[in-house]
């Protein structure tokens, strides 16, 4: 039996080894193994059990001399001793003996100058299907000569014992940058594999002069490129899927000297309240070859109920970028971005739905990474919680935030890009901004039409706010107009402004100009 070099990991007697199977073969294996069911559209549908989102508190980085001084240790990048990592790894390897093993050998990074080769070793065929569709798939020639830079082992069926293993729970995501190895166990949420790849890219690329971004990206027919930063649930995937523009990617990109490139070859979209009217591209991508997680499906008709969140609010679908009609399949733009959009979901209801930032404000709001945690993207979040996530991607950034902030400033300055802050969250009415209005605002930013508007300065946040945009009721553009109780509006403004100021105190390395670009707290 061909083992494709698995013995180098210590997996010496698997019952079967499958490498780079087609989506059809992987779907067959998953059904045979009882991992999921087929929907009426032909998609493979699985339930991931108790873990339906990232388990952020269960992620650890192996603390070795080689990386100790590089990693920004803290509540996000928690250290674990090498010996503990080795002990868990040995148990996971032992667990995989005599089991079927599914390998996907592929790539992250569409630009060949910066590509990293990943070997993903899966216990589950369904997870192997997911990563096959999410990463960049090799040609036959590339597969023949394949040599992995990094390896990820995903064994959801192996449960850690915290008292013995030194973990927080039965689940663990363990990253050893020195050994170029990631071990994921105890959780079946496929997003953990994808985000482990992202964490690796965020470690590797800055050393190559590339700015890694938690963003979506698209480009106009004439090549003008835009990037959309934002945390889960703020609209990256939705807003970058634009029928008038080519989608480069929906979540993870690198900004090089001459282009933006996708790390991935697929998309991982939220399914809650999905409709053919609201998001036709995503809705139509749920077909054969796609992996659907935690969407309620009728057992008889095999039809989805996207509005039912009883399995998870964070229901998801993974599919290859080819399933989006206007995808840029090369995964690369032909130029650097001219428009940079920071997406935020403000639960206070006081940030303007769109505003323009100067250079210092761009640095301030990027580093702050303000949003409200939206239900479902992490275990235990059910109501919006205001939060700050450094550089809109703190859970995935192993290096000091100043590294990424400096890279943004340098790239924006070089490309002369316009930077906008877009609030996809709530306003004074207590309702969330309509998607159609947000789309109209984003379109105005991309086409430059927004520049024809008159701008006023927001008294608290100092940003420039347009007073009119085609297709958007003018009263919604100025947050104060949506509040009946002006005193309550002022109180909310101050509450949020103070949160910003308090949060920014930890960034002691920032210039006085950048600090002064923040909100005015009284």
Which sequence ranges carry the predicted segments?
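Glycine-rich, often acidic-flanked micro-motifs
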Residues: 2-42, 50-51, 206, 214-231, ...
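Conserved lysine of the Walker
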Residues: 236
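Generic C-terminus detector
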Residues: 476, 481-522
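N-terminal accessory targeting/assembly segments
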Residues: 1-144
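Gly-rich Lys/Arg/Thr-decorated short loops/hinges at beta-loop-alpha junctions or inter-strand turns
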Residues: 68-73, 176-185, 385-391
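Charged, amphipathic alpha-helical linker segments immediately N-terminal to NTP-binding catalytic cores
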Residues: 148-150, 154-204
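Hydrophobic positions on the alpha1 helix immediately C-terminal to the Walker A/P-loop
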Residues: 239
């Amino acid at each position: 039996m061909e083992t494709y070099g698995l013995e180098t990991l210590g997996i010496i007697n698997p019952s079967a080894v499958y490498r780079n199977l087609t989506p059809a073969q992987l779907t067959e294996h998953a059904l045979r193994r009882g991992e999921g069911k087929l929907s009426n559209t032909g998609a493979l549908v699985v339930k991931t059990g108790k873990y339906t989102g990232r388990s952020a508190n269960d992620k650890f980085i192996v603390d070795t001399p080689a990386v100790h001084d590089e990693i920004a240790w803290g509540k996000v990048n928690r250290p674990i001793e090498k010996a503990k990592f080795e002990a868990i790894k040995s148990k996971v390897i032992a667990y995989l003996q005599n089991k079927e093993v599914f390998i996907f050998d592929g790539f992250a990074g569409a630009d060949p100058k910066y590509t990293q080769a990943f070997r993903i070793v899966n216990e589950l065929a369904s997870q192997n299907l997911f990563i096959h569709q999410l990463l960049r798939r090799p040609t036959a020639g590339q597969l023949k000569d394949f040599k992995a830079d990094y390896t990820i082992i995903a064994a959801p069926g192996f449960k850690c014992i915290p008292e013995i293993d030194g973990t927080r729970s039965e689940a663990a995501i363990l990253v050893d940058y020195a050994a170029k190895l990631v071990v994921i166990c105890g959780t079946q949420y496929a997003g953990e594999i994808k985000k482990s790849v992202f964490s690796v890219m965020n470690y590797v690329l800055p050393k190559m002069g590339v700015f890694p971004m938690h963003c979506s990206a698209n480009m106009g027919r004439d090549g003008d490129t835009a990037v959309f930063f934002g945390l889960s649930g703020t609209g990256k995937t939705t807003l970058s899927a634009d029928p008038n523009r080519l989608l480069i990617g929906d979540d993870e990109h690198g900004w090089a000297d001459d282009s933006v490139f996708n790390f991935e070859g697929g998309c991982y979209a939220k399914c809650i309240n999905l409709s053919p009217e609201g998001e036709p591209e995503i809705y139509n991508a749920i077909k054969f070859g796609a992996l659907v997680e935690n969407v309620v499906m009728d057992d008889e008709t095999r039809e989805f109920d996207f509005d039912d969140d009883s399995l998870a609010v964070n229901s998801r679908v993974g599919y290859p970028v080819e399933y989006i009609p206007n995808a840029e399949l090369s995964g690369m733009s032909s130029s650097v971005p001219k428009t940079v959009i920071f997406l935020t979901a403000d639960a206070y209801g006081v940030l303007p739905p769109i505003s323009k930032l100067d250079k210092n404000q761009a640095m301030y709001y990027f580093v702050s990474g303000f949003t409200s945690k939206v239900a479902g993207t992490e275990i235990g979040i059910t109501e919006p919680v205001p939060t700050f996530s450094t550089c809109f991607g703190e859970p995935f950034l192993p290096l000091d935030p100043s590294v990424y902030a400096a890279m943004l400033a340098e790239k924006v300055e070089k490309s002369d890009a316009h930077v906008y802050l877009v609030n996809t969250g709530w306003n004074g009415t207590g309702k969330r901004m309509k998607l159609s209005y947000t789309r109209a605002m984003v379109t105005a930013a991309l086409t430059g039409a927004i520049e024809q508007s008159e701008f006023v300065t927001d008294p608290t946040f100092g940003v420039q706010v347009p007073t009119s945009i085609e297709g958007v009721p003018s009263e919604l553009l100025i947050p104060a107009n949506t509040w009946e109780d002006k005193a309550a509006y002022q109180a909310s403004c101050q509450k949020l402004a103070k949160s910003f100021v308090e949060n920014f105190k930890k960034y002691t390395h920032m210039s006085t100009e950048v600090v002064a670009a923040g909100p005015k707290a009284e």
